[in-house]
Amino acid sequence: MAEEYKEALLEKQNYHDGCPGCKVEQMKQLRRGYPYLELSFVWIIVLSTSLPISSLYPFLYYMIEDFGVAKTEKDIGFYAGFVGCSFMLGRALTSVFWGIVADRYGRKPIILLGTISIAIFNALFGLSSNFWMAIGTRFLLGSFNCLLGTMKAYASEIFRDEYQATAMSAVSTAWGIGLIIGPALGGFLAQPADKYPNVFSQESLFGRFRYALPCFTISAFALLVTVLCCFIPETLHNHKLDSLSHDDSYDILEAASHESSPSTGKAGKNERKASQSLLKNWPLMSSIIVYCVLCLHDTAYSEIFALWANSPRKYGGLSYSTNEVGTVLAISGLGLFSFQVFVYPLAEKLLGPVLVTRYAGALMIPIQMSYPFIAGLSGLSLSLMLNCASILINVLSVSAITGLLILQNRAVDQSQRGAANGIAMTAMSLFKTVGPAGAGILFSWSERRLNAAFLPGSHMVFFVLNVIVVVGVALTFKPFLTTSRR
């Protein structure tokens, strides 16, 4: 009886022989049980793309100092911001292009291209000998870093409907952990000849290039992921007509017959129409806008936290070494992983993605207000309060972003997910381009107003971060943020 049911189900779905997307759909229909293998693949690929994004922040302060471009100590944050934003500028310029390519040629080729580019350009960044080489290699790394948008589409296609929240949670968890573990690696492995002289001599490669070891480590991991990606299935369908509803079949068939004629030029027109329909899809566009605002906060916070922790106490910082910053971020990564695996799916099921985003954003505000006061502590109390605040901020930030990823993928069909996520990546990258540059300039400015009457020093920095969060939370209310009925 069960076999007859399966056959009837497969026949009803009208799968196509030789279509990789149909093979995945068949697998989803017939498979029972938790998708551990697929979840592992998604998790490790997204982790590989997020590791290099923030890995430079713990040592960027010292890297800029070594380049000798900053005239004074207070100018270091200014130059650090431009190195940080070059990655996002590159990604902003290419995200839509990679999304369209993924919709046309498949997810798997784009995933392979992305992991290979990480291995190459991140290693070259570690070998940077001057300010402009650092900016150039980070720009190229961002230009070819096309994985996040593609992986969001891929994750929504490889899992059954009941695991969609888990899929998006896996994407955002791996992304968030990569943004934490990456800086932790940067903190522990930068300047190895100074920290571990028994292992690395000053005359060795890592003694001459003080920041190459964390970059090479991440590149080696990306190479390993590239090999694993050869075994993942393609999810894009290579047929179009049979999956459409009978109500639309006549119109689409007529359009297809016109497209087959070279004289009509309908194909390009239809593609432009599809692109325009995405821009008019308000559930998609509203969720992308909120997503961009919260991502702006996320990237600005990441850079400011590292600069603030590294900066001297006389400027309101913590005077932390790269190792100490790495320890805080590693602990935050553990807390984030535990929360996203065990708590977030339950929270999303209970509250829904909109409320999760709203509540998470609101809770970040009082925690960020406490950071300048935490800097006044010392010893065990400083470590305890700083680690608790860092864990909470990272957990809440990733939870808010996860809810928006779910809303974005619910707002479009499969044929548009690559392009939709490309639009989201472009918009987000533009905001994240502003984030590091703005954060560096803001931080440098705050160190010049330590005795100001209104929000002196780091108080101003964290106040601006809270303003961004308040805007993001306000946009989660109707009529601005609407959800799709798909």
Swiss-Prot record:
- One Gene Ontology CC term in the entry: plant-type vacuole membrane
Cited InterPro entries: MFS, MFS_dom, MFS_trans_sf, Tet-R_TetA/multi-R_MdtG-like
GO terms (BP aspect):
response to nematode; response to zinc ion
Localization (cell): Vacuole membrane
Looking at the Swiss-Prot or TrEMBL record, what is one Pfam family this protein matches?
A: MFS_1
The source's domain of life comes to Eukaryota
Record keywords, A-Z: Membrane, Transmembrane, Transmembrane helix, Transport, Vacuole
The residue ranges crossing the membrane are 41-61, 82-102, 109-129, 131-151, 170-190, 212-232, 288-308, 327-347, 362-384, 391-408, 423-443, 461-481
What tissue specificity does the UniProt entry give?
Answer: Strongly expressed in developing leaves, differentiating zones of root tips and sepals of developing flowers. Restricted to vascular tissues in older leaves, mature roots, flowers, anthers and filaments. Not expressed in developing anthers.
Task of the protein? Major facilitator superfamily (MFS) transporter involved in zinc tolerance by participating in vacuolar sequestration of zinc.
Query: What's the protein name?
Result: Protein ZINC INDUCED FACILITATOR 1
The organism named in the record is Arabidopsis thaliana
Taxonomic path: Eukaryota, Viridiplantae, Streptophyta, Embryophyta, Tracheophyta
